[in-house]
Amino acid sequence: MPEYEKAMRPEDITRLFVERSNVGDAAGVAALYEQDAVMAYPPGGQTVGREAIRALWEKVLANRPRFEPEQPLPTLVSGDIALTSTPPRDGSGARAQVVRRQPDGSWLRLLDQPEFVPPAR
């Protein structure tokens, strides 16, 4: 795996995600996740583990979507765990991630809720 820039602050992960996604780098996006991370995607489902997350992003990024930077909401930090979130540009809810500080001081996603879907009625 190539040497990627590390997120040295929890908020760095969102910027790195946008940069890597916009060049189609699924492995680079997956490198932002812990080995056993859980992503709440596709809607209503879960993708578990860095390799499965990489495979998912490979499919998504094959369509060459364009991601725009989103202004982060205030980060909540408790020790080595942080909650980061961003409001989508269209104002429809929020995205949230739980990230954990690694032994080298960098941060990786542990839990990722990329979009909130209202429950079915």
Locations of the language-model features?
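A beta-strand edge to alpha-helix "cap/lid" segment located at domain peripheries
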Residues: M1-G28, V38-R121
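Short glycine-dipeptide loop
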Residues: Q35
